[in-house]
């Protein structure tokens, strides 16, 4: 090779290097000049399936228990043991794929993902890297997204859609913990081999809030399908997030920044905090002329910061290989159609049903959060007489679910799980029917509800008689007489009211309510008083 050609290649290399630096510097300058960086988020969610036994063994699959009390020989990787696929887990994965509007694969396969931890006795995890059971799909997030870190075009119409790349079956690992004396690691294999699905999203979210909305939507779907209880606090749903940032120029060109993975976020609040912190960290690094490195990080809930677990140089090489002890998983179209024919109403459909029936978006959102709360609403509606759907929804969302959550001290569990039998949906429906027909006022209904929440199981009529004196005064003549007496006893207030001091009407209504022990309907009282003050009999 001649010196001339070497010089030419050297010059070409320098030009390319200069171009890279220039492009990078433009991106930094753009960010520094006020061109806001866009946050890009994807999620990887591991969901424990509600199966009686584990994915590849007959050992019981349940949360908790004495350490190592639910371990089959295969779970402990004893020599000579082989995996036997749980058909129930397959059916749940198919059901989830249908709900996500994904493409259920009639032929999928299992792989070995090799790595070593003390709680992984096989030295590999059985998963579906090459050929997952579901490809594609979408999560439709209900509700209004708003806040400081909401995406621009996604924060007003509640129409966030997050694409799903894949859903794959895999087995869970055991659980490691540090011994009390700090001298060793304890391993509990109760969780080892439990059936999981991993749900991998597209990078379609633009904030921590949108990531939370996606996970919440998935939680609801999983619960309605009875695929999982999806309780993050018990590890039934574990979330990893991938975070990157990019300039408007990069967005226009359809390219993404270097991503960082944050592992094992175990609450919705942690997801939002971790994404927000990591996006800010990226922006700070880039503004200082640095470069984002691909790495895996964890989130410290105490400091609100992410911490490096593994750098790019130390990322694991899992050496995926086909699972030799399991044949391909083959389904038929009839299998998939049979499962599709048994699909329940999903939360988004339930939400639309409630809103179209007149319930507010806020109350509807609260009610459809759990299948049990939706069922409670439906049973109450069947027993509420002429009560409007909107009134029933608001009462249940605010007075019952709200009170139950306050008593439980948590919002992540089913709020009605500890509701007393006295406050059944049927009895609450009948109570609201009495409000609709004028027997009770809204205030009276709340007083009766308090008795029900305190496990008062007497007949509803007896409770109404005891607490509300039988309900609102139903005789117009009796109520008119009381209003006349108030007008006679308050001549100065009446004179001022007739002179235009309209606020005094409230004082007169209050006096009538006092004389009736709260049993009068304030609207009826106000109308009667207005007629009397105007000179009508």
Curated annotation (Swiss-Prot):
This is Glutamyl-tRNA(Gln) amidotransferase subunit B, chloroplastic/mitochondrial. Belongs to the GatB/GatE family. GatB subfamily. Subunit of the heterotrimeric GatCAB amidotransferase (AdT) complex, composed of A, B and C subunits. Allows the formation of correctly charged Gln-tRNA(Gln) through the transamidation of misacylated Glu-tRNA(Gln) in chloroplasts and mitochondria. The reaction takes place in the presence of glutamine and ATP through an activated gamma-phospho-Glu-tRNA(Gln). GO terms for molecular function: ATP binding; glutaminyl-tRNA synthase (glutamine-hydrolyzing) activity. Keywords: ATP-binding, Chloroplast, Ligase, Mitochondrion, Nucleotide-binding, Plastid, Protein biosynthesis. Disulfide bonds: none annotated. It comes from Ostreococcus tauri. Pfam families: GatB_N (PF02934), GatB_Yqey (PF02637). SUPFAM superfamilies: GatB/YqeY motif, Glutamine synthetase/guanido kinase. The gene is GATB. This protein may be expected to contain an N-terminal transit peptide but none has been predicted.
């Amino acid at each position: 090779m001649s010196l001339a050609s070497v010089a030419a290649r050297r010059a070409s290399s320098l030009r390319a290097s200069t171009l890279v630096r220039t492009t990078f510097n433009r991106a930094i300058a753009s960010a520094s000049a006020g061109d806001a960086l866009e946050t890009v988020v994807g999620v990887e969610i591991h969901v424990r399936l509600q199966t009686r036994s584990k994915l590849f063994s007959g050992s019981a699959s349940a949360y908790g228990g004495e350490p190592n009390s639910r371990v089959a020989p295969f779970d402990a990787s004893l020599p000579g043991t082989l995996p036997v696929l749980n058909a129930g887990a397959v059916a749940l994965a198919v059901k989830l794929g249908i709900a996500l509007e994904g493409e259920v694969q009639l032929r999928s396969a299992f792989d070995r993902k090799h790595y070593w931890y003390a709680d992984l006795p096989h030295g590999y995890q059985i998963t579906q890297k090459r050929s997952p059971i579901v490809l594609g799909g979408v999560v439709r997030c209900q509700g209004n997204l708003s806040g400081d870190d909401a995406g621009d075009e996604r924060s007003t119409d509640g129409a966030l859609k997050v694409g799903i790349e894949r859903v794959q079956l895999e087995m869970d690992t055991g659980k490691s913990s540090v011994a009390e004396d700090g001298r060793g690691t304890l391993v509990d294999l109760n969780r080892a081999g439990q059936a999981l699905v991993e749900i991998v999203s597209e990078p379609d979210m633009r904030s921590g809030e949108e990531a939370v909305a996606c996970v919440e939507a998935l939680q609801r779907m999983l619960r309605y399908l009875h695929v999982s209880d999806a309780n993050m606090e018990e590890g039934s749903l574990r979330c990893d997030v991938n975070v990157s940032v990019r300039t408007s120029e990069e967005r226009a060109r359809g390219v993404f920044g270097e991503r960082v993975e944050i592992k094992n976020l175990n609450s919705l609040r942690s997801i939002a905090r971790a994404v927000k912190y990591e996006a800010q960290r990226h922006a700070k690094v880039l503004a200082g002329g640095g470069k984002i490195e691909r790495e895996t990080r964890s989130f410290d809930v105490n400091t609100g910061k992410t911490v490096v677990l593994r750098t790019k140089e130390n990322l694991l090489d899992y050496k995926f290989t086909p699972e030799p002890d399991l044949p391909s998983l083959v389904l038929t179209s009839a299998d998939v159609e049979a499962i599709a024919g048994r699909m329940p109403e999903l939360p988004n459909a339930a939400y639309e049903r409630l809103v179209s029936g007149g319930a507010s978006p806020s109350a509807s959102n609260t009610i459809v959060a759990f299948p049990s709360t939706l069922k409670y609403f439906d049973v109450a509606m069947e027993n509420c007489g002429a009560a409007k759907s909107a009134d029933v929804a608001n009462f249940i969302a605010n007075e019952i679910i709200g009170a139950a959550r306050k008593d439980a001290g948590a919002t992540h569990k089913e709020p009605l799980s500890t509701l007393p039998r006295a406050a059944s949906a049927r009895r609450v429906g009948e109570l609201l029917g009495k409000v609709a027909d004028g027997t009770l006022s809204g205030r009276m209904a709340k007083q009766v509800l308090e008795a029900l929440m305190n496990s008062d199981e007497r007949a509803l009529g007896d409770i109404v008689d005891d607490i509300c004196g039988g309900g609102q005064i139903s005789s117009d003549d009796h109520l008119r007489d009381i209003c006349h007496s108030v007008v006679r006893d308050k001549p100065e207030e009446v004179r001022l009211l007739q002179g235009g001091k309209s606020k005094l009407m409230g004082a007169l209504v209050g006096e009538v309510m006092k004389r009736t022990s709260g049993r009068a309907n304030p609207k009826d009282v106000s109308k009667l008083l207005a007629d009397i003050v105007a000179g009508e009999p």
